[in-house]
């Protein structure tokens, strides 16, 4: 798990499991975005039943044809609301390298007014 910008972390699924609760608390994580495919729902799912952590679970196919852009407004709103409450957000997928990283990058581009050029 790495802090990409202040308060926004990116990591693999393993960083959001029950045995990581102390680490999540030490980093001040209050919100988690769980990114998975429908077929991963059996094993990529919220693991922490702690009322201090708010989850957003997104079913996003890990394919070249998935329209991930349609999820950006929901992700942005969730992260913005967490920040307004002085929270910190972990975004994770299975490995934390494609779908979840894309969502984090899109948030940063929107927040700082960056283009793809």
What are these regions (language model features)?
Residues 97-103:
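Glycine-rich nucleophile elbow surrounding the catalytic serine of serine-hydrolase chemistry
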Residues 1-91, 103, 109-117:
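Cysteine-based protein phosphatase catalytic domain of the PTP/DSP
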Residues 94:
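P-loop (Walker A) phosphate-binding loop of NTP-binding proteins
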